[in-house]
Regions:
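Sec-dependent N-terminal signal peptides of Gram-negative exported proteins
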Residues: 1-11
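Long, charged/polar, soluble alpha-helical segments
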Residues: 9-139
Length: 139
């Protein structure tokens, strides 16, 4: 029963993120969503609920990827939009630290889901960092 209620709340939360019309806020909310999912993944890990754990870990990567897509949809080169890219990069770096700790704590059965999400987060982080550190395009 509790998981059904939790699943409903999560679906509403994700829909609220996707419905945000302002791209900058959408990117921030997507990272908020990712952080909440990682916190929930830790709780599910401690309680032993493997299905909810896997879903929460995957939600973390989805949120970070959606943040990157929202930032890219702004249409500006990242070096011209550092105000939004750099905070996103820092928050994804924090997510990477947290998911690495979770990977080290997770059991061997749970580890593949965490490793896959960590790989996806690393890809998002590298894309954000490359964008921030790249030179401005010539006009």
């Amino acid at each position: 029963m509790f998981s059904l209620v939790l699943l409903t709340i999560l679906a509403i939360d994700w829909e609220a993120v996707r419905a945000e019309p302002v791209l900058e806020k959408r990117a921030q909310r997507a990272l908020d969503f990712a952080q909440e999912r990682l916190t929930e993944a830790r709780k599910h890990y401690e309680s032993g609920d493997d299905a909810a754990f896997t879903k929460a870990v995957n939600g973390t990567a989805e949120g970070a990827e959606y943040c990157l897509a929202s930032l890219a949809a702004m249409g500006k080169h990242p070096s011209q939009n550092v105000r939004h890219y750099k905070p996103a990069e820092m928050r994804v770096r924090e997510l990477l630290r947290r998911i690495t700790t979770l990977r080290n704590d997770a059991s061997i059965e749970q580890r593949p889901a965490v490793v896959e999400s960590e790989r996806r987060l690393t890809a998002v982080h590298e894309t954000l960092l490359d964008g921030v550190m790249s030179k401005r395009p010539r006009s």
